[in-house]
Amino acid sequence: MEAARPPPTAGKFVVVGGGIAGVTCAEQLATHFPSEDILLVTASPVIKAVTNFKQISKILEEFDVEEQSSTMLGKRFPNIKVIESGVKQLKSEEHCIVTEDGNQHVYKKLCLCAGAKPKLICEGNPYVLGIRDTDSAQEFQKQLTKAKRIMIIGNGGIALELVYEIEGCEVIWAIKDKAIGNTFFDAGAAEFLTSKLIAEKSEAKIAHKRTRYTTEGRKKEARSKSKADNVGSALGPDWHEGLNLKGTKEFSHKIHLETMCEVKKIYLQDEFRILKKKSFTFPRDHKSVTADTEMWPVYVELTNEKIYGCDFIVSATGVTPNVEPFLHGNSFDLGEDGGLKVDDHMHTSLPDIYAAGDICTTSWQLSPVWQQMRLWTQARQMGWYAAKCMAAASSGDSIDMDFSFELFAHVTKFFNYKVVLLGKYNAQGLGSDHELMLRCTKGREYIKVVMQNGRMMGAVLIGETDLEETFENLILNQMNLSSYGEDLLDPNIDIEDYFD
């Protein structure tokens, strides 16, 4: 059998993964080495391309994520050769990867950008949906059109967006924290956003622009071949645009929040009936909860002893790095979160193998105002920087750490508000000797600044505050701001004039 295998193809540079990190890395390498073939190995027939990139400030950036067929990438970069197949095995000692189609690809430098997989609260249950990529988002839309009630488990960015976007369907949202959006916000910011959630949504929404899906041309057989339910790359910003997230009922928002609880058990209808369990109706306006007489396809028992029936469950409980295909026979150093450990040049513990994006775990001495979060902005930055490091190593040059790792900076949208997160925006790891300064105009803006020893360490800006560039500079230059006191957030003082 071995003799029938096609001869290995060789590429000086091989990149695995068609998400933002992998495509950015491949594009950067293709630009740097126009006469070299860059191999991009991806299990999916579509790739994620960064378009309309805008540098808002030194570090803050905005871009669109466009989902395209891999042929479009080849048109832009003729020296990128896309291999549409999953990875079966990595033979690091032989500098070779074996793809699912049985082919071998020899590399001189390899970058692993295979992303992460959703942590499902329950594997193999047809009523539990994990939303991670476009295919699962479209499956969710299909299920929602028939749904009267759904349950969302989790408190990350996708859960936040879903809860705001879903209409015409009862939503029970279970989170293990005291407040929503714990990864991104403290209780104050959560309260600010929750008031927006409870208010009825107007039909006219601000037009989003970041994600466009151009996937109509993709082949059906290619989709099934890619096993997209397992390996899809992460959704970009505004992933729900173009999806009509409406249930069967004629109302806008009906959300019930269950805090400080997790899923204890999931029952299918037959099991629920046999066990003679009792479930609650959807809680309404502080009325006492009553037993639900309606039968549902699936039931969720929470750790607070409440049981609710629903049409299906959305598992939005985070991700785990997708390292599985690469571990067998290779002694990678792994981080506590299961990611491939990378040094300050995005190099893993194995020779000539780099990693970027959700699959990796940073293990260098981090800047005091930067932290790794598995977000699309960091995927782009890491993919870009990994390519620079691979290029420098192959030509024997040295390279400085990229400036984007000096300060954590992320801009996004939640509940139709612009949200900017800077530095240690939630006082992550700062100990108890920090203080917070707040300014809040209900329905318009929420500003929180994290101070330590008179210096700004982080900030959360919700709404159109126009303070991001000033605050970015203040965090970066670590100027002592003690003398300004509360004036820093005084709306009557133009703070930018102070620090021009």
Swiss-Prot record:
- Entry's localization field: Nucleus; Cytoplasm; Cytoplasm, Myofibril, Sarcomere
Q: Which cofactor does it need?
A: FAD
| Outcome recorded upon mutating Q372H | In MFM8; decreased function in cellular response to oxidative stress; no effect on subcellular location at nucleus and sarcomere
One of its Pfam families is Rubredoxin_C
Q: Report the GO terms under cellular component.
A: nucleus; sarcomere
**Which residue ranges have biased composition labelled Basic and acidic residues?**
213-228
Q: Which residues carry this modification: N-acetylmethionine?
A: M1
Q: Provide the residue span(s) of the region labelled Disordered.
A: 211-235
GO molecular function terms noted in the UniProt entry: NAD(P)H oxidase H2O2-forming activity
Q: Would you identify the family this protein belongs to, as annotated?
A: Belongs to the class-I pyridine nucleotide-disulfide oxidoreductase family. PYROXD1 subfamily.
Its predominant location is nucleus
Task: Return the EC number.
Answer: 1.8.1.-
Q: Which disease is it linked to?
A: Myopathy, myofibrillar, 8: A form of myofibrillar myopathy, a group of chronic neuromuscular disorders characterized at ultrastructural level by disintegration of the sarcomeric Z disk and myofibrils, and replacement of the normal myofibrillar markings by small dense granules, or larger hyaline masses, or amorphous material. MFM8 is an autosomal recessive form, clinically characterized by slowly progressive symmetrical weakness affecting both proximal and distal muscles, with normal to moderately elevated creatine kinase.
**What is this organism's lineage?**
Eukaryota, Metazoa, Chordata, Craniata, Vertebrata
Q: How is the cofactor bound?
A: Binds 1 FAD per subunit.
Example GO BP: cellular response to oxidative stress
Q: Which UniProt keywords apply?
A: Acetylation, Cytoplasm, Disease variant, FAD, Flavoprotein, Limb-girdle muscular dystrophy, Myofibrillar myopathy, NADP, Nucleus, Oxidoreductase
- List the protein's name: Pyridine nucleotide-disulfide oxidoreductase domain-containing protein 1
Q: What does this protein do?
A: Probable FAD-dependent oxidoreductase; involved in the cellular oxidative stress response. Required for normal sarcomere structure and muscle fiber integrity.
